[in-house]
């Protein structure tokens, strides 16, 4: 254990990449507890400004001088080994911790850690559960991978023993955590730049299950075949949920005019209560069931669970209504995996519209390549597809895969699809082609949301 929440109170902790959503949240938690915090990032942003206003020393750019007087340095997986601050820390024998290790050590300071894992839906479910926990007045500390209006950001510091966070499987980060309640929302093939195959991913989730103590809880989507194959690994209390099976089920589902589900929550064939969602799609019914199960396992009152679920209107970049222009609706979603895109388009299909334009920006070359066949089959609910270039993120273009190749395959399948290389060209195309009553859906984990903002702000 390199970091101790109590013993290290007087330490100076430096974050490399402090502008990231998770790193900034960790820094903010420590600032609340009066740690000395500094951090560097390549660009200033509203996040770095917020941290500076709270007392952090912020450096723009990475230089060895930035880590002066630091006792511990936390870095993300995106930071290269030749980063000058990393090199300087090694030369001066300053302790280095990666973000997941640090978060794991931080969790040791809490008794009731709730870790939300799964290939899809982590941010939404963590946010939804946060609403429930706040309604139940358990005063949780919250660390979420998106901006949540109810906490005015991505982090909340509470005074109780409850800690709610996402648990990402990328690079097995979630295996460094200490969940008392661990949720698995789904298991799908993703991050194949790190994992060998789906079995390798399932093996990581099996290890995650084993982290939960005997008196803790595994909350799992019981209708997911990949979860079914590993749930036997649990040596703790298990609560499953689903539409047609599971300990907690959703019955009598109806959708309103905005595709939001209303349903009865059933346990042992007995109705517990009814709930009305304010987020669309079947996938959000499942996300809400996971939140309900965790609430019940945490002995929260049903009325608080209902109020928490029904007060949740989504997070930024998760089927987020960006606005309307000339009676044309613009919605943005973070979906970047074929399963997520299918779920998002299914929800959009139920949303009032004439024609549905899906503006998609593939995220990373490795994901586009390894899941290429799946990407060719997930856009069928769109009336027209517009493809931007691949968002590289942490990767380099090797020339093996491109958005044009995906576009060719979609056109071969008879789908109306157009490729563009510039956001301005996409905006102009939408100006010319989107008509009264149409729906524009921007999709992807990169910066494709800018297209919708450009269109609305004309």
Swiss-Prot record:
Subcellular location: Cytoplasm
Residues reported in the UniProt entry to bind ATP: 118-124
Main localization, broad class: cytoplasm
Enzyme Commission code: 6.3.2.8
Keyword tags: ATP-binding, Cell cycle, Cell division, Cell shape, Cell wall biogenesis/degradation, Cytoplasm, Ligase, Nucleotide-binding, Peptidoglycan synthesis
Gene Ontology MF annotations: ATP binding; UDP-N-acetylmuramate-L-alanine ligase activity
Family matches, as Pfam families: Mur_ligase, Mur_ligase_C, Mur_ligase_M
Function noted in UniProt: Cell wall formation.
Family (UniProt): Belongs to the MurCDEF family.
Name of this protein: UDP-N-acetylmuramate--L-alanine ligase
Source organism of this protein record: Clostridium botulinum (strain Kyoto / Type A2)
């Amino acid at each position: 254990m390199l970091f101790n929440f109590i013993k290290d109170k007087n330490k100076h902790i430096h974050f490399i990449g402090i502008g990231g959503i998770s790193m900034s949240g960790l820094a903010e938690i420590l600032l609340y507890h009066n740690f000395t915090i500094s951090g560097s990032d390549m660009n200033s942003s509203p996040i770095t400004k917020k941290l500076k206003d709270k007392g952090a020393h912020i450096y723009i750019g990475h230089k060895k001088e930035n880590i002066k007087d630091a006792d511990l340095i936390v870095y993300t997986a995106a930071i290269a080994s030749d980063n000058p601050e990393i090199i300087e820390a090694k030369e001066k024998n300053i302790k280095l911790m990666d973000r997941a290790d640090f978060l794991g050590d931080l969790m040791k300071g809490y008794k009731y850690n709730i870790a939300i894992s799964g290939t899809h839906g982590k941010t939404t479910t963590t946010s939804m559960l946060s609403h429930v926990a706040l309604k139940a007045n358990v005063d949780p500390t919250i660390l979420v991978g998106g901006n949540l209006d109810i906490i005015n950001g991505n982090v909340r510091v509470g005074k109780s023993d409850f800690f709610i966070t996402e648990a990402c499987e990328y690079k097995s980060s979630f295996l460094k955590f200490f969940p008392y309640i661990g949720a698995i929302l789904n298991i799908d093939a993703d991050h194949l730049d790190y994992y060998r195959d789906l079995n390798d991913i399932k093996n990581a989730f099996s290890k995650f299950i084993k982290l939960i103590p005997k008196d803790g809880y595994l909350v799992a989507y019981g209708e997911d075949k990949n979860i079914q194959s590993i749930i036997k690994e649990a040596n703790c209390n298990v609560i499953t949920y689903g539409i047609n099976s599971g300990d907690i089920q959703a019955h009598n589902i109806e959708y309103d005019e905005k595709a939001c589900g209303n349903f009865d929550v059933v346990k042992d064939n007995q109705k517990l209560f009814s709930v009305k969602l304010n987020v669309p799609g079947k996938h959000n019914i499942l996300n809400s069931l996971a939140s309900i199960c965790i609430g019940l396992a945490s002995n929260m009152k049903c009325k608080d669970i209902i109020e928490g679920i029904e007060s949740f209107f989504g997070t930024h970049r998760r089927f987020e209504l960006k606005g309307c222009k000339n009676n044309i609706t613009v919605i943005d979603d973070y979906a970047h995996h074929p399963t997520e895109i299918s779920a998002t388009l299914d929800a959009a299909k139920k949303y009032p519209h004439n024609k549905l334009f899906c503006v998609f920006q593939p995220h990373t070359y490795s994901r586009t390549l390894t899941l290429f066949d799946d990407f060719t089959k997930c856009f069928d609910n769109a009336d027209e597809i517009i493809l931007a270039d691949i968002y590289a993120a942490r990767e380099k273009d090797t020339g093996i895969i491109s958005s044009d190749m995906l576009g060719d395959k979609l056109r071969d399948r008879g789908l109306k699809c157009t490729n563009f290389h510039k956001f301005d060209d996409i905006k102009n195309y939408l100006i010319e082609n989107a008509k009264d009553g149409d729906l524009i859906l921007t999709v992807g984990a990169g910066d494709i949301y800018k297209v919708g903002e450009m269109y609305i702000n004309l």
